[in-house]
Structures are given as C-alpha cells and as structure tokens.
Amino acid sequence: MKNNLHVFLGATVADAAARPLHWVYNQKKLNSYIKGKKDFTFLKKNKSPFYNIKTGKVSGYNEIGQVMFQTLLENYEDIEKEFKKNILKNFGPGSKYWKNLNLRSKYKKVKDWRGMIKGPWIHQNIIETVNNIKSNKKISGGVKVNESDGFCAALPYFLYGYDFKSLEKIIRIVTASKISLKYALAKFYIIDFALKGAKDPVHEFIKRFKKNTSFKVIVNDIKKIRRLNSKFHPITIKTVSYTHLTLPTTL
C-alpha cells in the first residue's frame, strides 16, 4: 500500500496551505482576513494568534506525521521504539518545539503573550507524550485533550499497509484518549473505503458501522453534520459538541 502515500502528500500540502489561519477562533477577525479573497490558501502573512512560522511550513499536527514517515523510511524492525526516539529528538528537550514551550511559561504574564511565540507550537498531547516517554511509561499518549495528533501520527503508518490492530498501538503512542482513538479509527476506515473505490466513503462507513456500539456516537454525529451541511459554518460549529469536532466537521 506504499503507493497510497499520495494521501499523506495531499494532507501535508493542505496543512501548509491553511496553516497561516491556524486557530483563528475570532469569527470577525477571520472574516476580515479572508474578505475579498477568492483564494486564502498560503497567506503570505501569518494570522495565527498563537504562534508564527513561515508560510509553507506545516503545523505540529502534520509534523508528527512527518516524524513517523521519517521513522518508516529508516526501515527499523521495531517501529514503535524508534518512533518514540524520534519524537524525543524532534519535539523533546533541545528541540525548537520544547524551547518555545519554555518561552510560553515565561511569556504567560504578558497580555496577548501567544502572539510573541516565534516558531512552532507544541501540542498538549505531544507535551504529555514526551514526558511519558522520558518516564518510560507503558502507554505514552496524552489523555488531557481529545485532539487528532494520534491520527496524524499514524497516517503514514496506515498508508504503508499496516493493519488496524497494529494501528491502535501507534495512535496510543501519541494519544491515549478513548474519544481520540475512536475518531482516529473512524477516519482511517473512511480513508480505507475511499482508497478501495467507494463512491461515498462516509456513507459506506455509516452503513458498515451503524450497529457497532463503539462507533455509535460517531455515526450519529456524522448524520447530524450532514443535516447541517447547508448551514453557515459557525452555526454548525456551535450546534455540534466541541468534543466531537475532530471528525464530523470535515464531512
């Protein structure tokens, strides 16, 4: 399945394209940034209120996938072990990500301190993962937030052709949240259906898993999002529980 890596390439380009608008939660500001623009990908000027990196560079979500991809290219037998080493190397002490984490602690006393961060922003799941790996914990993934870091980390691994059972182990290296794990697996099933030629991969997921208790909430959320599909996006966001935004709002 290695020839399916075009999916990761597409995800990387999309991440870089949207990155200058990363985490712009203020709707009025967002509207002003994109006003009059037919194409607001790869904005030259950073608009993220949290951190500032050059246009063309990717966010931490894609970066963790890049670390996995590099681990796979190195062709180790024990991918899990080497992936953890590479996480420490790229995100842990001594890295630009960890340096900026320390600066965040320093700047927090300053109003609007987030805009002072020059360089990448390390995510909560990755902070926990780094600390847990250093502490030799059996399950290293973060548990404090329900985010998509685990999915992003496992995407290249999945596209290399590894099965769903081993996929869970990779996801748990970065996130141990039960909600994040379920949504990550759901996304992988949808991608799998798409790669196998399903006309409507999302509908195929609903059909296959509508009676599966593990995915019941996800199936219901997808149906809810599809009913709201014609609504103005901010209205949809407010309607759907924030906990479950990881998957359905993209459908």
Please provide the spans of the model-predicted regions.
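A short, hydrophobic C-terminal helix/tail in secreted or cell-surface proteins
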Residues: 246-251
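Structured, active/binding-site neighborhoods that engage oxygen-rich ligands
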Residues: 1-245
